[in-house]
Amino acid sequence: VTATVHPAVERADLLIDLKRYEEARELLARRLAEDPEDVRAWVKLARSHLGDEKDGPKALEATERALALDSADTGALVMHAHALRAAGRFLETEDVLREVIRLAPDHWYGYALLANWLWRIRAIRSGQANGGQVRREDQDAALREAGELAQEAIRLGPEEVFAYEVAWLIADMAGNRTVADRLDEAILRLDPQHEQALARRTKKAATAPGVNAAQAATLYADALAAAPGSAPMRSGLDDASYRLLRGIRWLALLCLALAGVGIDLFATEGRTQRELPLPLGQRLWDLVPMAVVWTLGALLRYRRLRAGVRVNLRSLLRRRTWPRIVLAQASWAMACALLITQIPWTDRTVPQVLFWAGLLATVATIWFDRRKNG
C-alpha cells in the first residue's frame, strides 16, 4: 500500500479544487494504472466523481477499492460516507462516521460531519417508523446528541469554521437563537468575510426595532464591502433602498398639502378665503417651504448616505419596476403642487381637481406596496 502521496495525486487534487474534474480523472486513471494499490488515488478519484457528476455508484466503487486496501484509512472512510450519501444510502453513513471517530478520536472532522448528518438520519428513521411523521421527541433527542458531537468538534478544532457552522445549524433547528447568535460571532471572529454569518448578523441589526431605512441600508452596504457576493445582503440592501425611495412620496404629499394651504383650496367655516389670483410674490413665496422640505428631507439625507447606498438607489431605479413607480408618483404629486401654486388661477375648481389627482394617485398604492421590496 502506498504510504506517501504521489505527485500525480497531488496535482489531481489541485485540479479538483479548480473544478477541472475530467482532467483530474484522466491523471488519476494513469496513476492507478501504474499503482492500483494507491489508496489516496482511489480516494481522490471518488472525490472527482462527487464533484461534477455527483455519480454516487462510481464514487462508491472507488472508496470500496480504497478500503479494501486499508480499512482503517479515515480519509477513505469519510469519502466513503459521502459516496454512500450520493448513492442514496444515507442511513448507512452513521456507522461509517462512528468508525471514523473510533479510529481518530482526537480529530474534529469526524465529530462535525456526524453532527451535521445525525439529526437528519434520525429524522428519516423516525419518519419511516411513524408513517411519515417525525416525532417531536425523536427530533429533540437527535438535536441534543448532534449538539454534543458539534461541541466536541469545536473543542478539538477550535479554529475550524465548519465545526461552528454545524453547531449553528443545530442551534437554529432547535430554536435556540441565543446560542445561534453567539456561534455567528465565533464564526465571524475566525472568518470576518463569512457570507452566511455576516448576512445573518446584518439582517438582525438592520431589522431591529428603531432602525430606520437609511441605517439599515448603511449596515447592508458596509457588510457587502466585506462579502460583495452575498445574495441575501444584496436583497437586504435593495429592500432598505426601496424603503428610502418610498419616503420621497411623503415629502411630495407634504408639498401638495402646503400648496393647498397656500391657495386656501378648501373653505373653512368662519374664515374668508384669499382672493384669486394670488400675487406673483405670494406664488414665489409658496415655493420656499417646498424647497425646505426637499432640502432637509431628501437632499441632505441623500448626501449623508454612504456612496454604496447612493449607487444602489440609482441601480434600483434601473433594475426594478416599483421604485420607478414610486418616483413617478412623487413627481406627479410635485407637478400638481407646482401647478396649483404657480399658475395665477382665478377659480379654485381646477386647483382642487389637481390636488385630488395628485393625492389619490399616490395614496392609492402606499398601503398596497408597504410589504414590497421593489
Predicted features and spans:
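N-terminal leader/linker segments that initiate helical-solenoid repeat arrays
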Residues: 1-22, 304-322
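Residue-identity detector for threonine
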Residues: 2-4, 63, 74, 93, ...
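Alpha-helical protein-protein interaction scaffolds
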Residues: 4-237
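Helical anchoring/docking segments at protein termini
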Residues: 238-374
